[in-house]
């Protein structure tokens, strides 16, 4: 894989990457097993930071429109606020997938995107003067194919992933005869310790069964059921207003990741991730609206959605604008923004 110079529309227009932003771009590879699309990685390093503790990855979905959005992902102020609070970098890939091309060729990290991602961390570490970037933990957010990618990275690299938010896309754990182009993953025991949130719109098969994206819920349900049955730290949050768009899910995603990173990131860069404590967790019915302390949950805990703390994953909260959120969402977001402005 080599650094690329030429760009093809619509991937030829994007913001400049001057410090604290840095960028690398790799050409498509013709080697078996390597990434067949060009890819552009942009990273933001919080100004003045001496030692990074992690990297937050904002991963787009499939198709030209979504892939193109990755060109500006590292410039998002909400995500920068989260990154700054935890001494993390913010990384946004942009896979230059043609509109009709097979998304699996990048959203399955085994098809070369996983290796390209790890390579970019080393190259960006050198550019930014932060050698620790190549080894710090990852916090992953992904939409659609990006959720498939983020979930795949949890299964392939559980010891590197602090937490993962999967919006409208998840990897398969069992082969699906109806989706022969998608390869199943295996579920290692170590992945059960990684906090994961499955987040989707209700129109993606939860209450609306004839939507174009109605197959999203069965896939999420299958992943959730298998992981939770084995004691995995996985939850479900359903947005009652959206379909395959992202809606207002960031208002919960950022706060959920904040909770996970506050617990899991090592105090000193280079040390191992901390395990999530068993005490303090909350449980909820997967498509329900309220969560309760785990010890007060009266249903089957192995079928219940898991939350790291008292964050209430109500379906109403995920969909409602920030000014109407009940506690603790608005104060948490406000604190993050205050951190970013200092």
Can you say where each PLM-predicted feature lies in the sequence?
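Alpha/beta-hydrolase active-site loop
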Residues: 105-132
């Amino acid at each position: 894989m080599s650094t690329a110079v030429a760009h093809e529309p619509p991937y030829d227009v994007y913001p400049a990457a001057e410090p604290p932003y840095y960028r690398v771009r790799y050409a498509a590879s013709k080697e078996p097993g390597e990434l067949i699309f060009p890819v552009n990685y942009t990273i933001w390093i919080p100004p003045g930071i001496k030692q990074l503790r992690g990297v937050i990855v904002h991963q787009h979905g499939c198709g030209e429109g979504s892939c193109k959005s990755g060109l500006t992902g590292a410039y998002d102020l909400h995500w920068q606020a989260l990154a700054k609070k935890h001494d993390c970098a913010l990384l946004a890939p942009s896979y230059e997938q043609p509109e009709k091309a097979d998304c699996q060729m990048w959203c399955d990290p085994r098809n070369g995107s996983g290796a390209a991602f790890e390579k970019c961390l080393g190259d960006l570490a050198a550019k930014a003067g932060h050698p620790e970037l190549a080894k710090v933990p990852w916090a992953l957010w992904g939409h659609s194919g990006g959720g498939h990618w983020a979930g795949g990275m949890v299964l392939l690299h559980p010891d590197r992933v602090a937490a993962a938010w999967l919006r409208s896309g998840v990897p398969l754990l069992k082969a699906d005869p109806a989706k022969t182009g998608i390869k199943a993953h295996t579920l290692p025991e170590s992945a059960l310790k990684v906090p994961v949130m499955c987040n989707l719109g209700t129109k993606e098969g939860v209450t609306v069964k004839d939507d174009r994206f109605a197959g999203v819920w069965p896939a999420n349900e299958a992943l959730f059921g298998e992981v939770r049955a084995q004691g995995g730290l996985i939850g479900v949050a359903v947005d009652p207003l959206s379909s395959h768009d992202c809606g207002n899910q960031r208002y919960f995603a950022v706060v959920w990741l904040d909770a996970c990173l506050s617990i899991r990131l090592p105090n000193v860069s280079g040390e191992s991730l901390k395990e999530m404590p068993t005490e303090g967790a909350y449980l909820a019915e997967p498509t329900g609206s309220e969560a309760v302390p785990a010890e007060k949950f009266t249903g089957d805990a192995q079928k219940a959605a898991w939350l790291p703390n008292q964050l209430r994953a109500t379906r109403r909260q995920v969909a409602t604008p920030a000014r109407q959120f009940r506690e603790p969402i608005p104060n948490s977001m406000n604190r993050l923004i205050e951190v970013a402005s200092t």
